[in-house]
Amino acid sequence: MKKIIMTGGGTAGHVTPNLALVPELKKLGYEIKYIGSIEGIERKIIEKEGIEYFPISSGKLRRYFDLKNFSDPFKVLKGVFQAKKIIKKEKPDIVFSKGGFVTVPVVIAAHLNKIPVIAHESDITPGLANKLATPYCTRVCVTFPESVKHIKGDKAVLTGTPIRRELLEGNKLEGIKLCGFKDNKPILLIIGGSLGSKIINGIVRKNLDNILSKFNIIHICGKSNLDENLENRKGYAQFEYVNEELPDLMKASDLVISRAGANVIYELLALKKPNLLIPLSKKSSRGDQILNAASFEKSGYSLVLKEEELEDKTLMKKLNHLYENRNVYINNMSKSKMDNGVKNITELIKKYTK
């Protein structure tokens, strides 16, 4: 039996694409193992899938000054030795890396063990982890056509992003039932990313009366961001984080407000959900979400509101515009030729398996 080690972590966006590949890889006869961080979000998600999980030391890679920049390289080095030992013992035929700081030691360790590595970059420009890992990769899968020029060494392959099959098979009635909605108001789904967004949470709750006058709200607000005072608010259902329920909640929604991570926007495109994107600002990120959002806005798939312009008035104006023009966005998304990347990526994995 062929064996693959997968890696990726830090946020759900570095894990869920891996899950999308699992059923197809199993169908192709691969035994799957996973290397991730000790305390990252990926551990719980992967172990729940029944996949053997190997935790390693990992340091965060930062583009800014922080005292931890002096200690974290030693954590990465420790992670390389741990990953090298795991890889030597498990003897995988190939490694698949989805990005996130935990993947750098795994990719280096695979290279030292002469194991081929396929990486995947979701955003238009590569994150720091993938930039550091690229020299040790055999191929780097990319989601956007614009990304090819940003990957050095002629290693880029345009594959699209992998989307979980079950996400496309949600049940609208189950989603509505889960939220306890009793009327026929359109449903607005708000996603702040797997770690939540205090800015989005705050402005939504500040304008709750206004929004609830037109919509029922499903609010996925992130860990420790629930508001107990809103538990029994009619038309408002809040969740810290959802996994199995997400397909049903997506199916039930008519509009979506979201950050602009590549994975989630491609899921919205696949589901043809009219969406308002609020990308992370340049101040609090490397600007990848701004580029992602601009690409989708240019294609007519999304409406965009910059975080710096996020105010009560602008939020309501954009939301109303999106709802009034929802069919225009649905039609634009219906014309998209973007593929689900599962088949493209698994074909590449097959090709380079030792």
UniProtKB/Swiss-Prot annotation:
It is found in: Cell membrane. It catalyses: di-trans,octa-cis-undecaprenyl diphospho-N-acetyl-alpha-D-muramoyl-L-alanyl-D-glutamyl-meso-2,6-diaminopimeloyl-D-alanyl-D-alanine + UDP-N-acetyl-alpha-D-glucosamine = di-trans,octa-cis-undecaprenyl diphospho-[N-acetyl-alpha-D-glucosaminyl-(1->4)]-N-acetyl-alpha-D-muramoyl-L-alanyl-D-glutamyl-meso-2,6-diaminopimeloyl-D-alanyl-D-alanine + UDP + H(+). Pathway: Cell wall biogenesis; peptidoglycan biosynthesis. It is an enzyme of class 2 (transferase). Pfam families: Glyco_tran_28_C, Glyco_transf_28. InterPro entries: GlcNAc_MurG, Glyco_trans_28_C, GlycoTrans_28_N. Keywords: Cell cycle, Cell division, Cell membrane, Cell shape, Cell wall biogenesis/degradation, Glycosyltransferase, Membrane, Peptidoglycan synthesis, Transferase. One of its GO terms (biological process) is lipid glycosylation. GO terms for molecular function: UDP-N-acetyl-D-glucosamine:N-acetylmuramoyl-L-alanyl-D-glutamyl-meso-2,6-diaminopimelyl-D-alanyl-D-alanine-diphosphoundecaprenol 4-beta-N-acetylglucosaminlytransferase activity; undecaprenyldiphospho-muramoylpentapeptide beta-N-acetylglucosaminyltransferase activity. UDP-N-acetyl-alpha-D-glucosamine binds at residues 11-13, 164, 194, 289. GO terms for cellular component: plasma membrane. Its EC number is 2.4.1.227. It is a peripheral membrane protein. PANTHER family: UDP-N-ACETYLGLUCOSAMINE--N-ACETYLMURAMYL-(PENTAPEPTIDE) PYROPHOSPHORYL-UNDECAPRENOL N-ACETYLGLUCOSAMINE TRANSFERASE (PTHR21015:SF27), UDP-N-ACETYLGLUCOSAMINE--N-ACETYLMURAMYL-(PENTAPEPTIDE) PYROPHOSPHORYL-UNDECAPRENOL N-ACETYLGLUCOSAMINE TRANSFERASE 1 (PTHR21015). Cell wall formation. Catalyzes the transfer of a GlcNAc subunit on undecaprenyl-pyrophosphoryl-MurNAc-pentapeptide (lipid intermediate I) to form undecaprenyl-pyrophosphoryl-MurNAc-(pentapeptide)GlcNAc (lipid intermediate II). Belongs to the glycosyltransferase 28 family. MurG subfamily. This is UDP-N-acetylglucosamine--N-acetylmuramyl-(pentapeptide) pyrophosphoryl-undecaprenol N-acetylglucosamine transferase. It comes from Clostridium botulinum (strain 657 / Type Ba4).
